[in-house]
């Protein structure tokens, strides 16, 4: 063995002794090299994300205009995690979460941890404590724009607090990012949009909270309403576009189009019908939709209703779509393996 190799082995042993097992290793020695994911709860978005869902242990930013469906997207992710036996938390900085609507989306509100903090510092400290516990699978912060620094709350209405929120987010993400990765928690930050003053060329839109969140996010989703969905003269929902504007785990700039129905959330059947039609799993002839020669219905809304009333056909079509895109179905939460990995590398290293 060469002197260089001996020196390296000695250094590695010293590092492991000082900082714990797993603090340094060769990249190929990692047990899980493939990105571990949890379904977003929406088939179209799972496909757009490229890996079948949200990557575990990563920061996700969901932003867009008001009432575009940002919180709905996050609540569907919570419902999916809970359905697979995971633990979820919701930091409601906007104090606007509707428990009735959340339960209609499939969220188990009896098991959902909810915090409605007074200040931005309190919200992020609660988030850090929950993540460092290692017992959480997903945490949603709604929203970054509502994380008001303590100094601003205690100050007068006209006081200027330049860059205070940006510094708060930058410090919080420096502390949170390592813990999020080690505990395999999915951290979803919901954000609003603002317009930069005096921009003549290019997009004037930006997100509040500084640049830190843009850098730390592995996935950034832009949610926008495209058009209203009508039944007769009544508006029953919105056609919504979700664009993956940043993606560190798969190619970015993919687009998912979904139907967000009022009081119901994202229409699973609508997404499935659109994707299945594109792949010719479901045949479309004029206004009629057919599957294996059997007619589903005339028009998109009637076909959606047929799929809703026949879950076995819906499940069969979903399986064919997932097989075509190479998605492994629903990612189960590997609790035992994660707990072991979590014990090997303690989180409260200061």
From Swiss-Prot:
This protein's GO CC annotations: cytosol
Keyword match DNA repair: yes
Binding site for ATP: 64-71
Subcellular location: Cytoplasm
Domain of life of the organism encoding this protein: Bacteria
Keywords recorded for this protein, A-Z: ATP-binding, Cytoplasm, DNA damage, DNA recombination, DNA repair, DNA-binding, Nucleotide-binding, SOS response
One Pfam family named in its UniProt record: RecA
Record GO biological process: DNA recombination; DNA repair; SOS response
A Gene Ontology molecular function term of the record: damaged DNA binding
Function: Can catalyze the hydrolysis of ATP in the presence of single-stranded DNA, the ATP-dependent uptake of single-stranded DNA by duplex DNA, and the ATP-dependent hybridization of homologous single-stranded DNAs. It interacts with LexA causing its activation and leading to its autocatalytic cleavage.
NCBIfam families for the chain: tigrfam_recA
Family recorded in the similarity comment: Belongs to the RecA family.
Name the record gives this protein: Protein RecA
Taxonomic placement: Bacteria, Bacillati, Bacillota, Bacilli, Bacillales
Gene: recA
